[in-house]
């Protein structure tokens, strides 16, 4: 088993990515390959950065990857906000994904604080 598989934040980030992919699959072709593709990349980035960072030799390096993971959540929320403003996502789903992103970013930051400097 890889170290990242033992981390709840990684499992949460994977669940977030799956929700983003589920949403982007509903987009029309007009948006699927533009904003949809960007959302998929940014939505997948948190789990990938947590996984990659967990293999770091130092806590400092791992913390850097966790910082990137948080910023990727922010990027995803920004993209979802554009989709919402363009009426490409329902308010209900937007609010749910927004809340999921907010919770995930807080959990990653909290975990980051547990790593020694």
Where are the predicted features?
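Amphipathic alpha-helical assembly/interaction segments
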Residues: 1-117
């Amino acid at each position: 088993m890889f170290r990242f598989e033992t981390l709840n934040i990684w499992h949460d980030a994977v669940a977030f990515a799956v929700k983003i992919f589920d949403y982007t699959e509903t987009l029309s072709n007009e948006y699927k390959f533009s904003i949809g593709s960007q959302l998929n990349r940014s939505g997948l980035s948190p789990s990938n950065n947590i996984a990659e960072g967990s293999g770091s030799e130092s806590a400092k390096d791992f913390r850097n990857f966790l910082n990137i993971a948080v910023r990727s959540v922010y990027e995803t929320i920004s993209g979802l906000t554009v989709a919402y403003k363009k009426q490409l996502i329902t308010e209900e789903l937007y609010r749910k994904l927004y809340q999921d992103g907010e919770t995930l970013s807080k959990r990653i930051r909290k975990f980051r604080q547990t790593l020694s400097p």
